[in-house]
Amino acid sequence: MSRSICTLTCILPTFSMDYWNQECVELSQVENLFTELASRLELLEMNSKNVLYRLTIGTNPDRNWEAIAFIREFFDSAKHGYVIPKHEIRNRIRLLSEASLISCLRWLLHRIPGGVITWSTYKLFDEAETRANYPVRGFDIFMKHATKHSCHFNILKCFLKLLMSLSAKLAVSSNSSTVSSLELVSQIASIWAFDWPMMNLQETFIYWDRCTNACLRLLLCYIRYTNKSSETGFSCLPSALQSQLQSFNYPPSLKKLNDAKAHVFTFSMNYYMTRDPLEMIQIVTKMNIPDHLTATLPRSSDDIQNDCLFALRQVSKRSSYHSVFSAQESAWTDFIKNGFDHPILPTCTQETVYSLLTGNDTACVYPFPNKPYRLPDVDFEIFSHCSFESLTTVTTNTNIWWVWAESRCTEIPESKRTVFPNCTMLIDKTGRLIILQQTVPQKPVALTASSNKRKNRIFGKIRRSFKRILKPRKINKTVKIMSNSQRRSCQSVLSEGNRTILLHLADQMNACSLQTKSRESIKTLKLIEEKDEYWEPETAGYFNTIVGWADQRKSLYDEAVIKINHSNMLNTLPPTSQGATSTTVSSASSNFLSSSCTPIDDTNSVTGSTLSCSFDEMKLSDKIDDANSLKDDDFIQGSKKDFFEMNLNHSSYQNKDELKPFQLLVKHAFKPPSYRLIRPPLRDWQSSDTLSSEMSKSISSSRSSPFSLEQTISKIQNKL
């Protein structure tokens, strides 16, 4: 009895670093990038009234894909010590939109160790300049010695030059009616210039005052150093800055910014820490508070300034945004209602799925609102655990609201979100600053029956979605070869959707099913025996491949590489030893990475970026060797197999009448999926991974999201 062996090997790749989520950067590596970004931003003509809003608030976080792709591409190109030429960086930056340009610059500002200036550098400069009696060229002389490296000095110069340019644009803005634009820019830039430790509110206001005075002094010192007169004796500075400089002496006197009163409303909840500013406002407006304090706090959204409320909506989108849901386009119709559909405020469903994906089972028990463009209707359960604590008055400045908004930007790494961690700032119609602060919960409380029931419903909905996707319709016992439409029914849904989320979520669901508290909610996804006559063998192998692959997942953003040994290599394969560990699986399941499957002429090769493959016609018996198949208990315990092997018996196919519907390998070839059907994976997205160079060049500047290629390409074709 002769046997042929077809080996399907799943090779997990080496995990590359996600450059966007790194905590800090090396100055020598980003010097040229920072210089070109700052220079480009200076040249942009921005409306002076929107400068502060664009710098601190930004755009919707689901449009950050351009900045994320740019940062990842830059660091990936600069690895192994390669220095990207300045002209190449400049050409790449010119293609960025204004929002992406600001996002990339803000990303760098928040990842420079110790801030752009750092306190050690400022103290050395202050001491040297004071002893020298403040010479005009003091910045160029003393700052070079205060900074440790020339790259730090160059970045600091570009930073101050950018602040000077923004001050000139803000000089005619209505936002700077109470203070000069130089002071206003220094107040906002304080969060970029220095490192901010964890402090309480009053200490934060004092620290902000200190940072602002240091920024203002360095900015005036730089302007004083660069203020060179022309041949006719006139200053080269903008006229708006010249008029402001007349009101400043050097060195400037220390100013107390905290000269206004603000109300701090403090409340507590026993088990829930809110992260959304709109949700916090809704909690306060619905909370029972003493009658004599109702006039002090806003009781509805009408009591908040329109501009402030609009900005809070943007901050709310950023606060509730998880990187896990960045795809936001799923091919699974009604997978989870609003689960991946442009999340604006966190929902209980999103938090449950997010907790599964991250392995944290504590975040999914809290009720969350789901009203996108207005103040959310918070679950009534949440108010039963809210309690009013105090209403106090602090001395601060209204402009610190811009610093608070900047502290909520998506570009700040999670480990550095130490500024205003538990509060929301808003401005009412009278122009008063109101601070809503929540105390840290002390201990969790037991879940109510309704919360458990809600969680079980979500788990059941997730599982039903898995069953609908992974178990296509069964076939009859009559002889029938797998058609293209049936193959697509069990492949295209996963390949066109967020397949990585599905794989990882399946793994997390199996892990949760082992827990006592989740056994009634989640049933383990078990392996299917391929000899079951009610299952298509191809579908069974496809299902088992997904379940086995989900058990081997190490990262959400890495794709496994599938290596296929073709039929012309079968004779050269070594025989399988009885002691080797292997798993029976259908080789046709290897095609599930294709978005479309269309029969074409035969081919015997797999090219680098395409997903085409060919198989010689082989016949398979109705009894498939399942001696090496995985047991359910082994999979639940996390057993991992390296190779998938399948023994095919040709001798049992002497008679064609014996052919059963369990034929796994047929003579098919699949052409690469068309551009219209491709959806990029969830991992680090790059246009070159999915599109051809010509296609990438034609649509790179026009699409609004890498996950809406189908709409973008159709629009381009309609225009042509």
Swiss-Prot record:
UniProt entry keywords in alphabetical sequence: Cell cycle, Cell division, Cytoplasm, Meiosis, Septation
Keyword Iron: no
Chief localisation class: cytoplasm
Gene Ontology cellular-component annotations: cell division site; cytosol
The keyword Cell cycle belongs to this UniProt entry's keyword annotation: yes
Localization: Cytoplasm
Superkingdom of this protein's organism: Eukaryota
Record-annotated disulphide pairs: none
Pfam families linked: Msb1-Mug8_dom
Cited function: Has a role in meiosis and septation.
GO BP annotations listed: division septum assembly; meiotic cell cycle
Transmembrane segments: none
UniProt name for this protein: Meiotically up-regulated gene 8 protein
Organism taxonomic ancestry: Eukaryota, Fungi, Dikarya, Ascomycota, Taphrinomycotina
